[in-house]
Regions:
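Active-site clefts of carbohydrate-active enzymes
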Residues: 29, 241-259, 298-333
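Aromatic- and glycine-enriched glycan-recognition loops and surfaces
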Residues: 42-63, 90-114, 168, 220-228
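Substrate-binding cleft of secreted/luminal carbohydrate-active enzymes
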Residues: 271-294, 308-381
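Polysaccharide-binding and catalytic clefts of secreted carbohydrate-active enzymes
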Residues: 65-66, 73, 114, 143-273, ...
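Aromatic- and acidic-residue-enriched carbohydrate-binding clefts of CAZyme catalytic domains
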Residues: 21, 28-36, 76-104, 131-160, ...
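Active-site-adjacent "subsite" loops/lids of carbohydrate-active enzymes
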Residues: 20, 28-50, 119-120, 125-175, ...
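Glycine-rich, aromatic-flanked loop segments that form ligand/cofactor-binding clefts
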Residues: 19-25, 65-75, 102-150, 186, ...
Length: 396
């Protein structure tokens, strides 16, 4: 397979830079990986945090990026004002304490000033390590809603099989969408955890789904929640885009039967069904692989997208020598292929791995691949209603 795909790549390098495409980064706030560098306890510290973000956004704007996926819910803690979950300690140094400003509101305003969209990146089911849950104390969802939570491999998760879990997630979504001028909401970890076979939900399955096979029941738990969230968002603010970042390989396809870790089989995630049902605006699969493990899976996503946007997530972090020591060409080959075969753009994990210009990636994007600005793509399925005739207009 590999020589075939390399031959194809050689033939698509001349693709013109699209006039419309998504050019995005995942901007990570957990542990302050991308932002902020340190918590703020003084006015000077707050201003330093804000300036940090402005510098990041300026660099992205200079390279004609047009979308930021900002991590707003980390592990049962958030970076915005919430009546439901505690503020993250990332910004203030203490759970439940805001840093003296609203990081999400500030980020939205600054993105919009630069003509960029700001999507709320929302970690769905993981709610913290034992240490984090203990540190959050009574503020933790594990303490406040123990019925919803399960401990698995030393971490805590909301259990998708408990019906009230969907109610809880939807309450967070409502608070976020109603309270902020976000352009979209993107669901991460909207799946069962790693080593899902040992996830302790047998009793819940017996109570709520014993007539259905466990794998099918698990997938349907997530499906129903996805549909419910999408329908609510489109009723409340139709222009807010709903997306997810599933595993990069949907299932074991004929072209790559030994695909390994997949969304459908391994973590009971069925994003193709979500698209077929029209319950996603965009799918952003985490495709941190090379060659045979990348190219055919791009095809697979695009072939099954039902007209929705497919935005491959590229592993810029894999260029690090401590990771996989990828080359710049490894990344640009993936951009070329995605453009040629129907992708709606690309996003990079993570922001700092682009802006630090590792192996010249930032310069390559700024000077070549993103040399000219690109508009975002129209969401045509949201505009299929004929507008009402204007009323109350008189011509003198």
């Amino acid at each position: 397979l590999l020589p075939v795909f390399l031959l194809i790549i050689g033939s698509v390098r001349a693709v013109e830079s699209p006039k419309r495409e998504i050019r995005a980064v995942w901007l990570t706030t957990i542990y302050g990986l991308d932002w902020p560098k340190k918590p703020a306890t003084t006015e000077a510290g707050r201003k330093a945090q804000q300036q940090e973000l402005c510098t990041i956004l300026d660099q992205l704007a200079d390279a004609n990026f047009n979308t930021v996926f900002l991590q707003v819910r980390l592990r049962g803690d958030v970076i915005y004002r919430s009546a439901i979950e505690p503020a993250s300690k990332t910004f203030s140094g203490k759970y439940g304490t805001m840093p003296g400003y609203d990081p999400l509101a500030f980020a939205i305003e600054e993105c919009h000033k630069r003509g960029m969209e700001c999507h709320a990146w929302f970690v769905t089911f993981p709610v913290g390590t034992e240490k984090a849950v203990k540190e959050q104390g009574k503020l933790s969802v594990v303490k406040r809603n123990p019925k919803l939570c399960k401990r698995h491999n030393g971490e805590w998760y909301l259990d998708p099989g408990v019906p009230e879990t969907a109610d809880y997630i939807l309450s967070l979504v409502k608070e976020l969408v109603n309270g902020y001028d976000i352009d979209g909401i993107q669901f991460d970890y909207i799946r069962y955890p790693e080593q899902a076979k040992t996830f302790p939900d047998k009793a819940v399955h017996q109570k709520y789904g014993k007539s259905t096979r466990l794998p099918d029941w698990r997938r349907e738990n997530i499906n129903k929640m996805v549909y419910r969230i999408y329908d609510w968002v489109k009723q409340a603010k139709p222009w807010v885009q709903v997306s997810s970042s599933p595993l990069g390989k949907y299932n074991r396809i004929e072209r790559v039967p030994n695909a390994g870790w997949t969304a459908y089989e391994s973590v009971f995630q069925d994003p193709k069904m979500w698209m077929q049902k029209g319950k996603q605006d965009m799918i952003v699969p985490m495709m941190y692989y090379l060659h045979d493990n990348f190219f055919p899976f791009v095809d697979n996503w695009v072939e099954n997208c039902n007209g929705r946007l497919v935005v491959p997530g590229l592993g810029a972090y894999r260029m690090d020598k401590s990771e996989a020591d990828w080359t710049v060409n490894d990344i640009t080959d993936q951009i070329d292929y995605s453009r040629y075969y129907g992708g709606a753009g690309c996003t990079f994990f993570r922001c700092a791995n682009v802006l630090d210009n590792s192996k010249g990636l930032y310069n390559e994007l700024k000077d070549n691949y993103y040399k000219y600005p690109a508009q975002l793509l129209p969401l045509t399925w949201l505009n299929d209603r004929i507008p009402d005739s204007p009323e109350g207009i008189c011509v003198e």
